[in-house]
Amino acid sequence: MKREKKDYYEILGVPRDATQEEIKRAYKRLVKEWHPDRHPENRKEAEQRFKEIQEAYEVLSDPQKRAMYDRFGYVGEQPTYQETESGGFFEDIFKEFENIFNRDIFDVFFGERPGQEEKREYARRGEDIRYEIEVTLSDLINGAEIPVEYERYETCPRCGGTGVEPNAGYINCPSCGGTGRIREERRSFFGYFVSERTCERCGGTGKIPREYCHECGGSGRVLRKVRRTVKIPPNVEDGTQLRITGGGNAGYYGGPYGDLIVIVRVKPDPRFKKSGSDLVYDVTIDYLQAILGTTVEVPLPEGGTTMLKIPPGTQPETVFRLKGKGLPNRYGRRGDLIVNVHVEIPKTLSREERKVLEDLAKKRGVTIG
């Protein structure tokens, strides 16, 4: 028996390239307009129109079902194909099935294999959300609490995540008659076969909503902005991932929330180089300061500065270690601030400077020139 083809796009009044948001808006508008309770004088026609709107939305709101509808013009039972002597035609058909359904063609001919899970549209976990956060070296000293804002899907407050309009209830699935299974009779290369598969329209439950939720369009989720505070532990490494349980998207149809995965990025500080829990700071002094001694100002990662005394006769590339001025390690003990001292030798001298140095060289018996 040949199936009557319906133009679901025409039923919802949307173009064939309509986005999911446009389809959802059209559905919300039409279910309100054609709800049978609003047409008591012509209830039978309204009920038929209402069912068509529901059926069209079920197909066009599901990317997989919509892809099949766009290719073949229907969803559900498959048409009977003419057998030919060349295998090319059937190979193309098999590929179409596998591309669209991600199912082995033999599952279609012989039914689902033992132990194979049924596809259900309920209680699926929500997706994880990945969020990058930038911290400074000062945040790594004692840890930090950083406010973040992001968008996530939350459980629909109108339907409580069921996807069903409140008080609408369920009806038997018209595709499977409430059994949750579809019986198929097919002709193949191997003969005539009878198979059973899970009903794709109801996910094997045998029931479908009488009316989808007007707030979420049947998904059970709505998009919301979320503000929360993320705790950053001391001295985390760049690229560290922190998992916040339940901080991701809401599950489908009452399923659990996914997680928020915070990826920590440590903002480079041009003053320091990080080496584990130690910090390295480079300072350059004049050769006279190295000879005579001096005091230099050294910045601290948490802010402020400390004074470092450079003794007379300090050699180039001398290293000074300021204990406990670095970053905390995993046990809470702070590393060191390592100061590398570079000595700058002037490339040019004034006459007076050269005269003074030459006199000094003679006194010290140093050969020059």
Curated annotation (Swiss-Prot):
Zinc finger (CR-type): 143-225
Keyword field: Chaperone, Cytoplasm, DNA replication, Metal-binding, Repeat, Stress response, Zinc, Zinc-finger
SUPFAM superfamilies in UniProt: Chaperone J-domain, DnaJ/Hsp40 cysteine-rich domain, HSP40/DnaJ peptide-binding domain
GO terms, biological process: chaperone cofactor-dependent protein refolding; DNA replication; protein refolding; response to heat
Compartments where found: Cytoplasm
Cofactor: Zn(2+)
Function: Participates actively in the response to hyperosmotic and heat shock by preventing the aggregation of stress-denatured proteins and by disaggregating proteins, also in an autonomous, DnaK-independent fashion. Unfolded proteins bind initially to DnaJ; upon interaction with the DnaJ-bound protein, DnaK hydrolyzes its bound ATP, resulting in the formation of a stable complex. GrpE releases ADP from DnaK; ATP binding to DnaK triggers the release of the substrate protein, thus completing the reaction cycle.
Protein name: Chaperone protein DnaJ
Organism (species): Thermotoga petrophila (strain ATCC BAA-488 / DSM 13995 / JCM 10881 / RKU-1)
